Amino acid sequence: MTAILERRESESLWGRFCNWITSTENRLYIGWFGVLMIPTLLTATSVFIIAFIAAPPVDIDGIREPVSGSLLYGNNIISGAIIPTSAAIGLHFYPIWEAASVDEWLYNGGPYELIVLHFLLGVACYMGREWELSFRLGMRPWIAVAYSAPVAAATAVFLIYPIGQGSFSDGMPLGISGTFNFMIVFQAEHNILMHPFHMLGVAGVFGGSLFSAMHGSLVTSSLIRETTENESANEGYRFGQEEETYNIVAAHGYFGRLIFQYASFNNSRSLHFFLAAWPVVGIWFTALGISTMAFNLNGFNFNQSVVDSQGRVINTWADIINRANLGMEVMHERNAHNFPLDLAVVEAPSTNG
């Protein structure tokens, strides 16, 4: 008997790289989306940390009045932020090599644009990586779909809104107090609290929290006892066990009697789909609302909508909100504008020389 041995050609370096990138045996899955995600998120994170600690003040309004945002320039964790790119730059792409010097780049808020653009690319790739890993493992794609909600929200406040307003200086600052300032100014200029898409987002976030707490407490309260009184109930579960760890019939019966029968899910799959879909759809709507208000399609205006028989205005809560909006608007960027936009719409009378 003759044995024929064929020499296998060694796999190319590129082939081995492809197999390693797409292998689901790695401790952390990389994937083709990860090839772009890793450097972009590392860049965004590194520049954020450095700028939050040491970036010099930024001329955010383009009027030669720099605003300090870093720790070394007098801020703390609460007040510190990455200050948005200057209004003098607008929507221009502003990498370091477009500035005359690094000092000019820092003064005009170049780090903000660098961080935001790398961050958005990175989180979009993270979403793609979630889909890619699900595909490799034969799973359904809904993890990436759910993650699209926060991606859409981040894209709305960091990219779509600045595009609509004409400048990255209108983007959300990267800090705690800066986020609150963004929210207050957004309310003043766009009346977001009266926008139905924001209302749907509030229902999504608060409702999702409520449903998550209800589900977790129901499951925890209907665990199948596997331990003694002296042991933690958590010891009664073994990872990968086939049998159910809680009694869904008991949970269904409890909740059906607490509210009414049809308020309780009797299908675990439809229940968990609902738990995922409710907050995701709500945040989708909020992101869509931000994106429409970016182009000044604002919240409802019910100002002075109720009058008496003499034509006198009877104030409603809408008028109270409007008064607060005007107060917030006149206080922000107070050195950049003589009047808020709402008070400057009337043309000045022409004078004949």
Swiss-Prot record:
Any idea which positions bind [CaMn4O5] cluster?
Answer: D170, E189, H332, E333, D342, A344
Main localization (coarse): plastid
- Record has Acetylation as a keyword: yes
Cofactor annotation comment: The D1/D2 heterodimer binds P680, chlorophylls that are the primary electron donor of PSII, and subsequent electron acceptors. It shares a non-heme iron and each subunit binds pheophytin, quinone, additional chlorophylls, carotenoids and lipids. D1 provides most of the ligands for the Mn4-Ca-O5 cluster of the oxygen-evolving complex (OEC). There is also a Cl(-1) ion associated with D1 and D2, which is required for oxygen evolution. The PSII complex binds additional chlorophylls, carotenoids and specific lipids.
Regarding how it is modified after translation, the entry says: Tyr-161 forms a radical intermediate that is referred to as redox-active TyrZ, YZ or Y-Z. C-terminally processed by CTPA; processing is essential to allow assembly of the oxygen-evolving complex and thus photosynthetic growth.
- Site note Cleavage, residues: A344, V345
Q: Which residues carry this modification: Phosphothreonine?
A: T2
Substrates-to-products reaction catalysed? 2 a plastoquinone + 4 hnu + 2 H2O = 2 a plastoquinol + O2
* Alphabetical list of Gene3D superfamilies matching this protein: Photosystem II protein D1-like
Annotated InterPro entries: D1/D2, Photo_II_D1/D2_sf, Photo_RC_L/M, Photo_RC_L/M_CS, PSII_D1
User: Which UniProt keywords are listed?
Assistant: Acetylation, Calcium, Chlorophyll, Chloroplast, Chromophore, Electron transport, Herbicide resistance, Iron, Magnesium, Manganese, Membrane, Metal-binding, Oxidoreductase, Phosphoprotein, Photosynthesis, Photosystem II, Plastid, Thylakoid, Transmembrane, Transmembrane helix, Transport
Q: How does it sit in the membrane?
A: Multi-pass membrane protein
GO cellular component terms attached to this protein's record:
chloroplast thylakoid membrane; photosystem II
Q: Which residues bind a quinone?
A: H215, S264, F265
**Compartment(s):** Plastid, Chloroplast thylakoid membrane
What are the binding positions for chlorophyll a ChlzD1 in this chain? H118
Q: Kindly list the residue ranges recorded as spanning the membrane.
A: 29-46, 118-133, 142-156, 197-218, 274-288
Propeptide, chain numbering: 345-353
Which GO terms of the molecular function aspect are on file? Answer: chlorophyll binding; electron transporter, transferring electrons within the cyclic electron transport pathway of photosynthesis activity; iron ion binding; oxidoreductase activity, acting on diphenols and related substances as donors, oxygen as acceptor; oxygen evolving activity
Under the heading SUPFAM superfamilies, the entry gives: Bacterial photosystem II reaction centre, L and M subunits
Q: Where is this site: Tyrosine radical intermediate?
A: Y161
Pfam families, alphabetized: Photo_RC
Name the Gene Ontology biological process terms.
photosynthetic electron transport in photosystem II; response to herbicide
Family annotation (PANTHER family): PHOTOSYSTEM II PROTEIN D1 (PTHR33149:SF55)
Subunit structure, as described in the record: PSII is composed of 1 copy each of membrane proteins PsbA, PsbB, PsbC, PsbD, PsbE, PsbF, PsbH, PsbI, PsbJ, PsbK, PsbL, PsbM, PsbT, PsbX, PsbY, PsbZ, Psb30/Ycf12, at least 3 peripheral proteins of the oxygen-evolving complex and a large number of cofactors. It forms dimeric complexes.
Q: What is this protein called?
A: Photosystem II protein D1
Q: What is the protein's species of origin?
A: Aethionema grandiflorum
Upper taxonomic lineage: Eukaryota, Viridiplantae, Streptophyta, Embryophyta, Tracheophyta
What gene is it encoded by? psbA
